[in-house]
Regions:
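Short helix-initiation/N-cap motifs at beta->coil->alpha
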Residues: 63-74, 161-193
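Short, polar/charged alpha-helical segment
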Residues: 31-32, 38-62
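Beta->alpha turn/N-cap motifs
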Residues: 39, 67-69, 79-80, 84-93, ...
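Periplasmic-binding protein-like
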Residues: 106-118, 143-150, 209-273
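Immediate post-signal peptide segment of exported/extracytoplasmic ligand-binding proteins
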Residues: 24-33, 54, 124-130
Length: 273
């Protein structure tokens, strides 16, 4: 009987010790807080999170979703996030210039092609003279649309526009507009809702996807795959040497995540690596 009690107590002690060890281990996991915009960025980063946590014991990723393009950088700069994943370099550069953020970008993630959609017209050439076209009201994406239209030969911009150096185009930089299109600047998140009122609107891929659009299938005009507007993972400048950053990029750029992008979005979103 004494032997039984001794063995039972010994087993109980070992169980308590094992439980405590697991609890301590869980408590020491480093949590990386990553901000994303809802839609494709959130969906894809969930896949990257799974790969990252699988391959890097001791780390956890907490994904925090936002519904606009301004707050993820504000939260990152304020230390409320450790990283974000939703923006291309021209947008980041514009935010740094305008707001004084000390942010650093590492690793390409995906390209969400900018595209022009309409509920009134099926072809770009059908959009009439004097049409009202919705475009994003942030400098980087507004410039992106105007450069796309210039590449298509619909408008012409003044010389010297280079979004990668922060020289963005606005409607006042249009020097030729033979179709006399009127550009209406609207918050990017609201552009899908404008399609009943405007002749057409240029919509970022994440907001287009949330509204049920696929740029490869539904648009009048879409960026090509060689677009310079690849999205990135951003951190505060002081965190650029953190060991988890390279691991996070590696997880995002894994074969599993690429396969998910190709299967889930069917050309509507492209892997940028």
């Amino acid at each position: 009987m004494k032997s039984f009690v001794t063995n039972w107590l010994s087993g109980l002690a070992m169980g308590v010790l094992a439980s405590a060890t697991i609890t301590v281990q869980a408590a020491t996991d480093q949590v990386i807080r990553v901000g994303v915009t809802s839609g494709p960025h959130a969906q894809i980063f969930e896949q990257a999170r799974r790969v990252f946590e699988r391959d890097n014991p001791g780390y956890k990723v907490k994904i925090i979703e936002f519904n606009d393009y301004i707050q993820p950088n504000a939260a990152l700069d304020a230390g409320e996030l450790d990283a974000n994943s939703y923006q291309h370099r021209p947008f980041l550069n514009a935010q740094i210039k305008a707001r004084g953020y000390k942010l650093y970008a590492e690793g390409k993630t995906m390209i969400g092609p900018m595209a022009i959609y309409s509920r009134k017209y099926r072809k770009l050439e059908d959009v009439p003279v004097g049409a009202r076209i919705g475009i994003p009201n942030d400098p980087a994406n507004e410039s992106r649309v105007l450069l796309l239209l210039q590449k298509q030969g619909i408008i012409k911009l003044r010389e010297g526009i280079d979004p990668l150096t922060g020289t963005n185009a606005t409607p006042i930089d249009i020097t030729e507009n033979p179709k006399k299109w009127k550009f209406v600047e609207i918050d990017a998140a609201q552009l899908p809702r404008t399609l009943d009122d405007l002749d057409a609107s240029a919509i970022n891929a994440d907001y287009a996807s949330k509204a049920g659009f696929n740029p490869a299938r539904d648009s009048l005009l879409v960026e090509s795959g060689d677009s310079p507007y690849a999205c990135l993972i951003a951190v505060r400048d002081k965190d650029r040497a953190q060991p988890w950053l390279g691991k996070l990029v590696q997880a995002y750029q894994s074969p599993e995540v690429k396969r998910y992008i190709e299967t889930e979005f069917k050309g509507g979103i492209l892997a940028a690596w």
